[in-house]
Amino acid sequence: MDRYLVFGHPVRHSKSPFIHTLFARQTQQELEYGLAEPAVDEFATTLRAFFAQGGKGCNVTVPFKEQAFALVDSLSPRAKRAGAVNTIKLTDDGVLLGDNTDGAGLVADLKSHGVALAGSRILLLGAGGAARGALAPLLAEHPTELVIANRTHAKAQQLAAEFHDLGVVTALTYEQLGGTFDLIINSTSASLQGELPPLSPALIHADIAIYDMMYGSMDTPFISWAKQYGARQAMDGLGMLVEQAAEAFTVWRGIRPGTKQVLRELKRNLGTL
């Protein structure tokens, strides 16, 4: 039976085995999907051993995405742009192909919620790996402007310069933010620490869409804050998790699974339905 893994540290909390098992059942694919939690300095050895022993593909999560980028034999265009790899496939000719499905998963989830991206003004909070992975897929949807805000302004400026060939990308400090945004995406991990980005509530209005890449069994702090100031549409990253997994499954198996029922099952599993 074809074997797949998710590599991370920590990774015991991962919902990837649950999701991919449902995808396999739905598409009648025979495979098994497990967890691997190597020490940070043992990732390369463990990854190579997995493929040497017949592994077909894997997902890679924190803190290994940048290491995976350096270890694979070839990169998809979107992985090159993201500077990180979250999906690896062993091709028929023995090549380890690195891909990044995070941004595609984000865009698919936004669209499933009816969020219009073309012609919109988007604010992206954070300039780390999650933001980098999201930029090219978001800009491919042709927003009028994408603004990056980050506590360290230089990081936002660097990211904006790197992606300016794909669209109108601006780097601003949190204090400089103004005007009306149609969508705010929080790519920071602030919600995991129970914290908020230093954002003015004046940016929140009834018609704005709010998206937090983090998720939990309750509203994240960022979503709760946005709702408190009048945001009517606020979404967490659970749908992105399922959509990026569907994209990875498609890369591996050549068949695209449906996501709606799997997301429903996952919410039930987490106790959020």
Curated annotation (Swiss-Prot):
Amino-acid positions noted as binding shikimate in the UniProt annotation, renumbered to this chain: S14, K15, S16, T61, N86, D102, Y215
CC terms in the record's Gene Ontology section: cytosol
GO biological process: amino acid biosynthetic process; aromatic amino acid family biosynthetic process; chorismate biosynthetic process; shikimate metabolic process
Keyword Disulfide bond found: no
Active site: K65 (proton acceptor)
EC number: 1.1.1.25
Gene Ontology MF, one: NADP binding
Swiss-Prot/TrEMBL keywords: Amino-acid biosynthesis, Aromatic amino acid biosynthesis, NADP, Oxidoreductase
Metabolic or biological pathway, per its Swiss-Prot or TrEMBL entry: Metabolic intermediate biosynthesis; chorismate biosynthesis; chorismate from D-erythrose 4-phosphate and phosphoenolpyruvate: step 4/7
SUPFAM superfamilies: Aminoacid dehydrogenase-like, N-terminal domain, NAD(P)-binding Rossmann-fold domains
Binding residues annotated for NADP(+), in chain numbering: G126, A127, G128, G129, A130, N150, R151, T152, H153, A154, K155, M213, G237
Domain of life: Bacteria
Record InterPro entries: Aminoacid_DH-like_N_sf, NAD(P)-bd_dom_sf, SDH_C, Shikimate_DH, Shikimate_DH-bd_N, Shikimate_DH_fam, Shikm_DH/Glu-tRNA_Rdtase
Keyword Kinase: no
Disulphide-bridged cysteine pairs: none
Reactions listed under catalytic activity: shikimate + NADP(+) = 3-dehydroshikimate + NADPH + H(+)
Membership in a protein family: Belongs to the shikimate dehydrogenase family.
HAMAP family attached to this UniProt entry: Shikimate_DH_AroE
Subunit structure: Homodimer.
Function field: Involved in the biosynthesis of the chorismate, which leads to the biosynthesis of aromatic amino acids. Catalyzes the reversible NADPH linked reduction of 3-dehydroshikimate (DHSA) to yield shikimate (SA).
PANTHER family: BIFUNCTIONAL 3-DEHYDROQUINATE DEHYDRATASE_SHIKIMATE DEHYDROGENASE, CHLOROPLASTIC (PTHR21089:SF1), SHIKIMATE DEHYDROGENASE (PTHR21089)
Name listed for the protein in its UniProt record: Shikimate dehydrogenase (NADP(+))
Species per Swiss-Prot/TrEMBL record: Aeromonas salmonicida (strain A449)
Name of the gene this protein is made from: aroE
